[in-house]
Amino acid sequence: LATTKPTPLFPTYAELTELSLSDYPQLSAYLENQPKWMQQHWHWAKDYLLYIGRNKSEHTYVRFRNDIEKFLLWVFMVDKQPVDDLRKADILRYIDFCVAPPVRWISTQLHDRFNLSNGYFASNLNWTPFRQTPPKYDKDRVLDPKKYKPSLQTLESTFVALSSFYRHLIDEEICFGNPIPLAKRDCKHMIKDSQVKTISRLTEHQWQYLLDTAVELADTDALFERNLFIISTMKTLFLRLSELSERLDWSPVMSHFWTDEDNNWWFKVYGKGKKIRDITVPQSYLSYLKRYREWRGLSSLPSKGEQTVLVEKIRGRGGLTSRQISRLVQQVFDAAFDKMKSEKGLEAAQKLNEATTHYLRHTGASMEIERDRPLKDLSEDLGHSSSATTDTVYVQVERKRRASSGKDRKVE
C-alpha cells in the first residue's frame, strides 16, 4: 500500500559493488517476502546501477539510483505490475504519484539509507524516497510534507533516468520497448520552458566582498585557509564542485598544477562526461596557491609528480567529498552575507544568501566574458563541447538583441 513506509533498496556505489544480501538483513527479508518477479526486478536494477556506477560519475549514480529506487518501490508497493508490462498510461500514473506522493514517503531531512550496526547494514527507518528541502535563501522555513511539489527539473531528471533504465533493459533483451518518451510527450506536468534564462552569478562587487571576507577569516583563523583556497580556485579556474572533490576514479593532487615549456601554468581536471582537460592558470592566482601551500608546510609551488592531496581532510586521510567542500564554501557565503547585511542592509546582501557553489564557476566565466576574452579559449577552459554552448549560457547574444529590439516600442 502507498501508505506503508517504504524501505531503501540500494546503498552507495562502493557498497553496491561488494553487496551481499546476508549483510543487509532487513533488505534481504523484504525481498524474500516479495514475489519472484519483484526479486528479479531488484537484480535487474542492481545490474543497471552497477553499470551506471562503472561508466558514469558518482553524482550520476546517486541521481539515477534515487530515481530507479523510487520507481521500483512504486512498482512493488503501489502498482504491482512488472516493469516490462508497463505502458505509457502506467508511466503517466507513476509521474502523477511523484507529483503528489503519500506523506509517509516524504521527509524534510536527509537520512542515510543504511546504518552499520553490529557488523550489518540496517535499513534506516527514517529514510524516505522523497525529500522536501527549503530554499537556500529561507533555510528556517517550516516545511509541510503535504505541500511537497517537485520542480520541473526534478521531473525532467526522472524521465531521463527511467528512459536510460528501459534502454538498458532493451539492450539486455528483457524489454522490447521504451514507454518513457511517449509518456513524457503526453505528460501534463511537463511544461515547455522558453523563459529568458539568467545567469546565477555574483556581481564583481559581491565577488570582491566574498573574497575579502574569506581573506579576513583566514587571517583570523588559519583553518579558514582551506576555505579561501577553495573559493578562489573554483571561481578563477571555473571549477564544478565535483572537479575539486575526491572521487572513486580521480583524486585531485598538487601535480595537477603543471607548467609548459613557456612557463605557463595549467591545471588538469577530470570533468563532466569523464573528460580530462587542462585549464589556464592566471598569474594573479599563484599568490593564493602559494599562500595555501605555505600554510600546509609545502614548497611555494607544486613540483612535477607531487602526489600531495589538493584539498585534504583535517582529520583522516584523502581528499574532501563534494558535500564537505560545499560546506566550506557555505561557511564563507554565510559570513559574507552576515557582514554585508550589517553594513549595507538585507536587500544588498540577499544574493549572497541565495548563492550556491556553482555561482563561483558562473561568476568567473561571466567576468571573463566582460573582459572580452576570446570565446573559444574560455569555452575550452570551461570544458564546453563548443563555443556555441558558452555563448548560449553566458553571452546570450540573441537575448540581448531581442531586448534591444523591443525596448523602444510605444504604448500609444
Residue ranges and their predicted role:
Residues D171-I174, M234-N263, D377:
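Short, charged phosphate-coordinating catalytic segments
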Residues A45-H59, E69-K197, L217:
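N-terminal core-binding DNA-recognition domain of tyrosine recombinases/integrases
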Residues E246-R291, G297:
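Conserved tyrosine-mediated DNA breakage-rejoining catalytic core shared by Y-recombinases
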Residues S326-E380, S387:
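Short, basic (Lys/Arg/His-rich) helix/loop patches that form interaction surfaces
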Residues L152, Y209-L241:
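Basic, Lys/Arg- and aromatic-enriched nucleic-acid-binding interface segment
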Residues T392-E412:
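DNA/chromatin major-groove-contacting recognition/catalytic segments
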Residues S163-R167, N227-E246, W266-F267, M367:
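Short pre-functional
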Residues G271-R291, E306-V332, E354:
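C-terminal catalytic core of Y-nucleophile DNA break-rejoin enzymes
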